[in-house]
Regions:
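Cap/lid segment of the alpha/beta-hydrolase catalytic domain
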Residues: 174-264, 311-323, 579-668, 714-717
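Primarily recognizes the serine-hydrolase "nucleophile elbow" in alpha/beta-hydrolase
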Residues: 267-338, 664-720, 725-728, 735
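Alpha/beta-hydrolase-fold serine-hydrolase catalytic core, especially in secreted/extracellular enzymes
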Residues: 30-154, 251-254, 300, 314-324, ...
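Glycine-rich active-site/cofactor-binding loop and its immediate structural neighborhood
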Residues: 130-190, 547-601
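Catalytic cores of nucleotide-enabled group-transfer and carboxylate-activating enzymes in metabolic
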Residues: 138-147, 157-158, 169, 203-209, ...
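Aromatic-lined carbohydrate-binding surfaces of glycoside hydrolases
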Residues: 87, 185, 217-260, 283-290, ...
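Flexible loop/turn segments at secondary-structure boundaries
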Residues: 184-188, 222-226, 288-292, 312-317, ...
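N-terminal export signals
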Residues: 5-27
Length: 823
């Protein structure tokens, strides 16, 4: 059984959440009513807590609150960016040096980090049927070309090339320009060789007609033709989203790959300039405008840039298509800040009618649904363009280079790109003062059998292959990341007795060796991979309400404040036979996707997946707590990831804070032993069990059920039918996760605390082979540390469910609790 079937069958998956279409929600209602109470004798609230009077859907209100916090932080982002910059306007050199750290951070988050191949002249591409000379225009010739970009990562995968058109002037070039089309325009459209772009917007040939050497790269489009796994299935994810999902996991991006292609063209231009120096420019529209802006921000060799149909306020980037999702972008970089990285060079912003994208391609029989459904593109509002340009002006004024920033409005921001005004400004800033020649007649394509889809497929497949090579290489990158921590281990030459005995002496008697050696790694993972919010800023202010009175335990709803608008909520089951002064072990029982605390802690709910495991543990004498995690509401909760990523946050930024506050409060209860609190989660709760305890020391052990697997493979595979690439769970992507951690590395961070995996052999989450492959590294590590008895895996004859046999024994043993309570 896979996750999708789990959702279809779970008792809570089909309930109507009734979430408002607005992102804003009403404050928590204070109804003053009481939950169901078995009899009048139990206390209506826990000692030391206020009455919980909030009514309504707690999960809905939790997700609403996170939305509120993210909207507020998004609104505040632009005002807080100066804290991340240290501009020095003393001179051009000092300024460039002062913004260099920001430029390098930007290079990292767009994934333009691989060293490019040495500059080489583009090669002509053709055959007997399709010769490389495509056409002859007014003063220039058009060739099909390919140029090298990135070398192979590993031996059995190729590198990355760019393909497109070269417009070579008949005379010595007066400038060299990369003309970047929108994603849905082919190079031929931008030159006028194919229909689809108005004559006035065929700006690539306008540069060639005026004596420029022009390269026009292919940009991957927004169709979904190749988005899938042949023989398994195809999705409606745009090509750009398909590439985004897998590349994000290895710290790369479809944007970064295309930046590299453009900058490889600039490499060649620069080499050509060794013969005779002429200015270098980049001009782009729509997606090409984004790429032009990003390239100019990264490369000082570009003298002047035109950005058309893109430049505007960028705080709402989460509303744009997901393939524009860049980790931490809005936190540090609006379009104005990127313009400041172009200084002291020149920028022309053309306010023009932008590409209109209303969502991904429609799902259909041969391309099933799975694409991120939110994300649209529309013409940048003129007032937004103007405001962002005005935000950028002080940066240029700081170096007394106000004239290097120009705004051109094409028909009040609604006109076509490539206007005469924009071209004149660009030519002037490139130092070309001759009058613009009138537009010539579009050239005619001499190729009779040219298929642009074959070229697109080649380029798309190359990007997929290059990314898969990076994924194959990621274990080595993780090894490099962990090298310092691993150096704390004893090596063979230090052994004076068998390894497990030596390691036992070093590790189990001094666990701080490992904790201290990995502190910087844990901080890095929290801050750079999951995104770190400050520790809870509000007092817990606990409110409780009795809801269950069962023969062996009482049940209370619990609400705790975490941050403004964000709270933690769950159900606490307290055994009745706890003696005064006794402190019991506690188990935090975490539900899965679309779940609720009631699924695990309500004796009347008979779930095929959870089997009342919080109830059963409470009946054994454990204190149990079932928290609500915010992965509920389908698309409404997934938007949290869209909103959070530009702020360098994620869904788990909030889950970690909620668990941190919960552990702090739970450990203070007079009937709980704070040193004996375990976490046991199913499915998405298993994700929690792998991600949270490595970073929160308050958990004494962790059990991952119905989730453990080789996570990098799971999220990026183009071979497996279980790949997340084929599904709608786009929120599973974490930036550069694969080069930093996998499940084994996260599990090892739990050590020396106990860790266990529970695995049903018919669980469709992953195959036993892959589960064993990843868990085997954990078993080896615990053995190497001399504590092999603190980890285990149980395979049972079942599906995506809590088994509760070996795991219950594991809890009893490692939380120091006796046999099941028979009272």
């Amino acid at each position: 059984m896979d996750r999708r079937e789990f959702l279809n069958r779970t008792t809570t998956a089909s309930f109507a959440l009734g979430f408002s279409s607005e992102l804003s929600a009403n404050p928590l209602s204070d109804g003053g009513g009481q939950g169901h109470v078995g009899d009048s004798s139990p206390k209506p609230t826990l000692s030391g807590t206020a009455p919980l009077t909030v009514q309504g859907d707690m999960a809905e209100q939790m997700v609403d609150g996170i939305h509120h916090l993210l909207l507020r932080r998004t609104k505040e982002a632009a005002g807080e960016r100066p804290l991340l910059w240290n501009r020095n306007y003393g001179s051009v050199e000092l300024y460039s040096l002062s913004v260099s750290p920001n430029r390098e951070r930007f290079r990292q988050i767009v994934g333009a980090v691989d060293p490019r191949l040495p500059a080489s002249s583009p090669e002509l591409v053709g055959s007997v049927a399709t010769p490389p000379l495509v056409s002859t225009g007014d003063g220039y010739k058009v060739f099909t070309v390919r140029w090298s970009v990135l070398g192979a990562v590993i031996a059995d995968f190729g590198g990355l090339d760019a393909e497109g058109l070269l417009l070579q002037p008949d005379t010595t070039p007066v400038a060299r320009v990369v003309a970047v089309p929108d994603a849905d325009w082919t190079p031929e459209m931008l030159v006028g060789l194919a229909p689809g772009v108005p004559t006035v917007s065929q700006f690539a040939r306008r540069y060639a007609e005026n004596g420029c050497q022009v390269l026009v790269p292919l940009i991957v489009n927004r169709d979904d033709t190749f988005s899938g796994i042949p023989g398994i299935g195809f999705t409606n994810e745009p090509h750009r989203e398909w590439l985004y999902r897998m590349s994000f996991e290895v710290g790369r991006h479809v944007i970064g790959y295309e930046i590299q292609k453009i900058l490889a063209a600039v490499d060649w231009f620069t080499a050509e300039n060794a013969k005779a120096r002429v200015p270098i420019g980049v001009v782009g529209y729509g997606e090409g405008g984004l790429l032009a802006l990003y390239c100019a921000a990264l490369d000082a060799r570009i003298d002047a840039t035109v950005v058309s149909g893109h430049f505007q306020e960028r705080e709402a980037v989460w509303k744009e298509p997901i393939y524009r999702d860049v980790w931490g972008l809005a936190r540090e970089f609006g379009d104005a800040e990127l313009a400041s990285l172009i200084l002291p060079r020149a920028l022309v912003v053309e306010a023009s009618r932008g590409p209109e994208v209303n969502g991904p391609p429609h799902a259909r029989e041969e391309h099933r649904g799975g694409a991120c459904p939110n994300g649209k593109l529309a013409t940048p509002p003129l007032d937004s363009v103007r405001r962002e340009v005005e935000r950028a002006r002080p940066f240029f004024a700081g170096l007394k280079l106000e004239h290097k920033l120009r705004l051109v409005e094409s028909d009040a921001g609604e006109g076509p790109c490539g206007s005469e005004g924009a071209l004149r400004e660009h030519f002037g800033l490139l130092g070309l003062n001759a009058p613009l020649r009138p537009a010539g007649i579009p050239p005619v394509d001499a190729r009779q059998y040219f298929d642009p889809n074959s070229r697109l497929q080649r380029q798309f497949s190359q990007m997929v292959g290059f990314t898969q090579a990076l994924i194959r290489k990621s274990p080595q990158r993780r090894k490099e990341f962990w090298a310092k921590a691993n150096s704390a281990r004893p090596v063979a030459s230090e052994f004076t007795e068998p390894p497990w005995q030596s390691c036992s002496s070093q590790w189990s008697t001094s666990p701080e060796n490992w904790r201290q050696a990995t502190k910087s790694h844990r901080d890095y993972i929290w801050e750079e991979v999951f995104g770190r919010l400050p520790s809870p800023s509000l007092p817990a202010n606990p409110r409780t309400r009795l809801i269950y009175d069962q023969p062996k335990y009482h049940g209370y709803e619990v609400m705790l404040d975490v941050w403004p608008d964000v709270f933690a909520y769950g159900i606490l089951l307290v055994p009745k036979n706890i003696k005064e002064g006794e402190r019991r072990p506690a188990v935090v029982c975490q539900h899965g996707l679309e779940g609720r605390p009631q699924d695990v802690a309500d004796a009347s709910v008979d779930s095929h997946f959870y089997h009342r495991f919080a109830v059963r543990l409470a009946e054994e004498g454990f204190v149990t707590y079932a928290p609500q995690n915010p992965y509920i509401g389908d698309e409404y909760f997934r938007i949290i990831q869209r909103m959070a990523h530009p702020l360098k946050l994620s869904l788990f930024s909030f889950i970690l804070g909620q668990h941190e506050q919960t552990l702090k409060w739970l450990g203070k209860q007079p009937f709980v032993d704070a040193s004996r609190i375990g976490l046991y989660g199913l499915s998405y709760g298993g994700v929690t069990a792998v991600r949270v305890p490595p970073l929160l020391d308050g958990y004494a052990l962790s059990i991952c059920s119905a989730n453990y697997n080789e996570w990098v493979w799971k999220t990026t595979s183009v071979e497996s039918p279980r790949s997340y690439l084929l599904g709608s769970e786009y929120e599973m992507c974490d930036f550069d996760f694969a080069n930093t951690v996998n499940y084994a590395e996260l599990s090892n961070l739990i050590a020396p605390r106990p860790f266990m995996v529970e695995r049903g052999i018919y669980d469709g989450v992953e195959s036993d082979e892959w589960v064993n492959y990843e868990y085997g590294k954990v078993r080896w590590f615990y053995s190497y540390m001399g504590i092999p008895d603190r980890t285990e895996i149980e395979f049972f004859d079942g599906e995506h469910e809590i088994h509760g046999v070996k795991t219950f024994e594991f809890l009893r043993r490692h939380l120091n609790w006796g046999k099941p309570d028979k009272s």
